[in-house]
Amino acid sequence: MALNLRKNHPLFKTINDALIDLPTPSNISAWWNFGSLLGICLITQIVTGLLLATHYTADTSLAFNSVAHMCRNVQFGWLIRNLHANGASFFFICIYLHIGRGFYYGSYLNKETWNVGVVLLLLLMATAFVGYVLPWGQMSFWGATVITNLLSAIPYIGQTLVEWAWGGFSVDNPTLTRFFALHFLLPFVIAGITLVHLTFLHETGSNNPLGIPADCDKIPFHPYYSTKDILGFALMLILLVALALFSPNLLGDPENFTPANPLATPPHIKPEWYFLFAYAILRSIPNKLGGVLALAASVLVLFLVPLLHTSKQRSLTFRPISQVLFWALVANLLILTWVGGQPVEHPFIIIGQLASLSYFTIILVLFPLAAVLENKMLNL
């Protein structure tokens, strides 16, 4: 009998084991779609990014004009640019929902998968930051100046680090050149580490909404979840194209339509919406080093989540007290995002400080305590 090529070919069998014959829990919901949506986001960003890179010039005197030229004179350049800029927003929407899903259903107990995922989040944030600098508008320039300057808060070596990152004594041509190099490189690093993320995931298999072992009831990934994923792709791409065609500048900053000018500071320097929660935490601490540490902690705290799991149950499905805390955390992040976009004045300062404090309190203190309380109440 002829061998089944799909199951025996060295290359095809890897793809088969990951996308076709993969045993998958039969009860996973639409919240499990976001992993594959992130894959589609990455592919979309790499393809549109490569097309943009063919017309972009990484030079301070030419960068802004090269982007304008792309939108005016290149066939469908406006569309490619709008898809790329808004694709970043969709990337972050998907990754935040993906992390929220992992948090809610206890997927972080697959520790290696979770930790690699946090590394992927950090890489994505780095990529988005250096990418935002490339059009060399006002907010690009001042965003780069403010955020790279945070390195100077590091004692003793801070100033040296900043000048090393800048390639000079201010954000200038060397900075733009290296940021373009990094922005080109990092998505491919993300693609590589995504494979590591998947490898670790397939060691244990997917979690499910009940948070219980599902080995007794698994179904093949294809055709069930492949079909479900394609529906997700269609819905997301429809939303992305709608945003890129109807309201491409909705999420951008009008300040970035002005070419970078080192002599004029914009009235409100703020990052893109997906960084506002961290920016609000940074601003809520009146000390520079303290702010930088809080900014780093706001994302790095995710590494601690598996260590703080005190419940005897994996998921929050049957834990109402922790559910209330979870949604309080979501609301808290939305408040931080809103405050991050507001000017630094009363009452936004105190709102930001309280929201920052409650962000860390909920994750580091209240979640572990609530889980212990629930264990007691359920006599576990």
Curated annotation (Swiss-Prot):
The chain crosses the membrane at residues 34-54, 78-99, 114-134, 179-199, 227-247, 289-309, 321-341, 348-368. Heme b b562 binds at H84, H183. Keywords: Electron transport, Heme, Iron, Membrane, Metal-binding, Mitochondrion, Mitochondrion inner membrane, Respiratory chain, Transmembrane, Transmembrane helix, Transport, Ubiquinone. Its cofactor is heme b. Binds 2 heme b groups non-covalently. It is a multi-pass membrane protein. GO terms for molecular function: metal ion binding; ubiquinol-cytochrome-c reductase activity. It comes from the Eukaryota. Heme b b566 binds at H98, H197. GO terms for cellular component: mitochondrial inner membrane; respiratory chain complex III. InterPro entries: Cyt_b/b6_C, Cyt_b/b6_C_sf, Cyt_b/b6_N, Cytb/b6-like_sf, Cytochrome_b, Cytochrome_b_C_euk/bac, Cytochrome_b_N_euk/bac, Di-haem_cyt_TM. A ubiquinone binds at H202. Component of the ubiquinol-cytochrome c reductase complex (complex III or cytochrome b-c1 complex) that is part of the mitochondrial respiratory chain. The b-c1 complex mediates electron transfer from ubiquinol to cytochrome c. Contributes to the generation of a proton gradient across the mitochondrial membrane that is then used for ATP synthesis. Belongs to the cytochrome b family. This is Cytochrome b. It comes from Ficedula parva (Red-breasted flycatcher). The lineage of its organism: Eukaryota, Metazoa, Chordata, Craniata, Vertebrata. The gene is MT-CYB.
